[in-house]
Every structure is written in structure tokens, then in C-alpha cells.
Regions:
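Short, glycine-/small-residue-rich phosphate/pyrophosphate-handling segment
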Residues: 133-168
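Short, acidic/small-residue loops that bind anionic groups at enzyme active sites
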Residues: 123-131, 136
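N-terminal beta1-alpha1-beta2 submodule of the flavodoxin-like/Rossmannoid cofactor-binding fold
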Residues: 19-103, 112, 121, 128, ...
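Solvent-exposed loop/turn segments at secondary-structure junctions
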Residues: 37-40, 61-65, 107-111, 138-142, ...
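A glycine- and small-aliphatic-rich helix-loop capping segment at beta-alpha/alpha-beta transitions
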Residues: 118-125, 153
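Bacterial Sec-dependent N-terminal signal peptides
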Residues: 1-23
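Glycine-rich phosphate/pyrophosphate-binding loop and the adjoining helix
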Residues: 159-190
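Short alpha-helix in the alpha/beta-hydrolase fold that links the catalytic acid
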Residues: 115-116, 120, 145-149
Length: 190
């Protein structure tokens, strides 16, 4: 009988702890809104989603960028130089349920790609009451990318962002950056 009571008490405590953890995760629902062309940002997002359980939403330009590097960079530079906000494909369902939004982007021409700016500034999404966390992948430096994401969401609160610097493309060797990413997530309590 004593063993039964100990077992029942232990089971109850485990179930209570699981329920509290589940409640905590549901209280602060997280979305990762991301854009990727070469695959680096996508690889980072996949890792973060796996570690945190966050939902993901891919920001896509309605008219896809060229698959070849040089023509893609020409299109992207023209958009930045002319402050063009290209049309994007859709918006996240139930955006209002998310308290935290990680905005993950590559650095293009010293800032976030213009489809991301469309998502942040021209989509009609309500950023008030949200916490936005900027993240970028870059070949050399983040330049103003993290600051530009913050500037584009003035009604949100913001947490410390992260720049993941890598000289590879297609997500190659991005796993070597996972310890840096994991330490950042831990610091943010995600």
C-alpha cells in the first residue's frame, strides 16, 4: 500500500509538472517568420524550431527571385535602391495568437531583403503587444539588418538579436553555428 501511495504521488507530481510546462509554452506562443534564398537562414530556422517548438512561416516574394546568384542580386539591389516593397505570398494564419516573433533573414545589400520589409511594414499585421527578436545570417557582417528589423516594428517590444556569420551557402556547415545559436536561445529563455 505504501508503494502504491508513493507511486501515485510521483505520478501526480510528474503530470502536474508536465501540465505547467505545457501551459508555459502555450502562454508565450512563438512564431519564426523567415526568408531565405541560399538556404542558410532556412537551416538556422529549422534548428531553432526544433529546439524551441516554435511555429514557422516562410516569407516569399510573389514573383520568385532568379535562381542564379548574379541576377538575384541585381533584382534585390534594384528593390533596395528604389525602396520597392514587392508583393509577398500570404500571411501567417492566426498571427494574433503569437506573443513572440523571431524575424530571421539573410543580409542583402546591408539590410533585410525587401520582401521582409513588405511583411513587417506593409502587410497590415499588428505588431503592438508582440516581442520581436531579429536574427540574420550574413557572409561578413550584419550591418544595419538587426536595427532595421527593430525600426520596422516600432509598436513591438524587442529582445537582443543575433547575427550568424558564415562563408558558406546552402546551409553548408551551418551546424557549426548551432552552439552559438543555442547559447543565444538560452540567454533569451526560449
Amino acid at each position: 500500500m505504501k508503494k502504491y501511495l508513493i507511486f501515485a504521488a510521483a505520478t501526480f507530481m510528474c503530470l502536474t509538472a508536465c501540465a505547467q510546462n505545457s501551459k508555459k509554452m502555450n502562454e508565450n506562443k512563438t512564431l519564426i517568420a523567415w526568408f531565405s534564398w541560399s538556404g542558410n537562414t532556412e537551416a538556422v530556422v529549422n534548428h531553432i524550431a526544433e529546439v524551441t517548438g516554435a511555429d514557422t512561416f516562410r516569407i516569399e516574394r510573389e514573383k520568385p527571385y532568379p535562381e542564379q546568384y548574379d541576377p538575384c542580386t541585381v533584382d534585390a539591389k534594384q528593390e533596395v535602391d528604389n525602396n520597392v516593397f514587392p508583393a509577398i505570398k500570404g500571411l501567417p494564419e492566426n498571427f494574433g495568437q503569437y506573443e513572440t516573433v523571431i524575424v530571421a533573414v539573410p543580409v542583402w545589400w546591408y539590410t533585410a531583403p525587401m520582401p521582409v520589409r513588405t511583411f513587417l511594414e506593409k502587410s497590415g499585421l499588428d505588431w503592438s503587444g508582440k516581442t520581436v527578436i531579429p536574427l540574420c545570417t550574413a557572409y561578413t557582417a550584419e550591418y544595419n539588418t538587426l536595427k532595421d528589423i527593430v525600426k520596422a516594428t516600432p509598436d513591438a517590444e524587442h529582445l537582443e538579436g543575433l547575427a550568424v556569420i558564415t562563408t558558406k551557402m546552402n546551409g553548408e556547415d551551418i551546424d557549426k553555428k548551432f552552439p552559438q545559436i543555442d547559447a543565444w536561445l538560452k540567454k533569451l529563455n526560449l
